[in-house]
């Protein structure tokens, strides 16, 4: 499914992340690349049938990238702790404890899976044999 991918700017918009000056593209790019590969592997032979489904694939890629980037983003805020009060005023992202981080990552993964649910489905039935 060549041609369907996202970039760091898409991830910044989706997650309302800080700009390049506060959070460099090099921090987010590996997570975007990983998410694109992960979503394409999940889809396998399924191909989006229209523009709306392509948008859902891109949304899933962004959601997976957010889930993958959360630990790094949390570390970014921890390492910048003395600057956090000023930065919190500039962004919606805040520091999370370990439990919150796991829940938030699961939320983003589930949102991504939900976006992929109907992509490339024909609406037919599937037969299963139990032996």
Residue ranges, per PLM feature:
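Conserved short "hinge" loops at termini or chain/domain junctions
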Residues: 1-58, 107-131
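Short loop/turn elements at secondary-structure junctions
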Residues: 2, 68-131
């Amino acid at each position: 499914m060549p041609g369907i991918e996202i970039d760091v700017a898409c991830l910044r918009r989706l997650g309302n992340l800080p700009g390049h000056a506060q959070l460099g593209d090099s921090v987010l790019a590996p997570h975007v690349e990983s998410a694109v590969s992960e979503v394409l592997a999940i889809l396998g032979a399924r191909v989006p049938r229209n523009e709306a489904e392509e948008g859902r694939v891109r949304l899933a890629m962004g959601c997976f990238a957010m889930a993958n980037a959360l630990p790094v983003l949390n570390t970014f805020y921890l390492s910048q702790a003395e600057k956090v009060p000023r930065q919190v005023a500039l962004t919606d992202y805040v520091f999370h404890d370990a439990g919150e981080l796991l829940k938030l990552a699961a939320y983003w993964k589930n949102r991504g899976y939900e976006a992929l649910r109907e992509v490339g489905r024909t609406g037919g039935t599937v037969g299963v044999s139990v032996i």
